[in-house]
């Protein structure tokens, strides 16, 4: 983004800016005054994590989404939001072949119910804030995300993060095998 002349402001870590807190969210956006905001903020983890922490996952993610849109509205910013909706928002029946026009044609899979549901909520919030307040949003359906800041905790990490971490740890420790959970089926 910097290469095309855009100023990139990376959100600080949660300990210095908690998007679940409205005052923190307003302070961040008031200081940054972004033209575009790529919303990657999420509390998410492995299938076990999102199931065992379903209430926290849906509450904290909904709070972050609402705080971002409310802060933009309250500060009268003309920020355009780019929201990422993970493939877990697709219906359970389409887990093998994703088609963009079918992403809301049924309930999300029970293994990702909390996170998949709140990703759909992201889309609904963006549409409502655009209708009433003119907040422009581009929603992208993404198959997966990986990068700096992701968890490498084996009980919390997504599959790709967990696998990379396990293989690196095994290589570093000279281990001859790596434990991989499950079959890959949802």
Please describe what each predicted stretch is.
Residues 66-113, 138:
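Conserved Rossmann-fold NAD(P)-dependent oxidoreductase catalytic core, especially the SDR/UDP-sugar
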Residues 19-62, 91:
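NAD(P)H-binding glycine-rich loop region in Rossmannoid oxidoreductase-like domains
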Residues 5-27:
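Adenosine-cofactor binding site in Rossmann-like domains, unifying the SAM/SAH pocket
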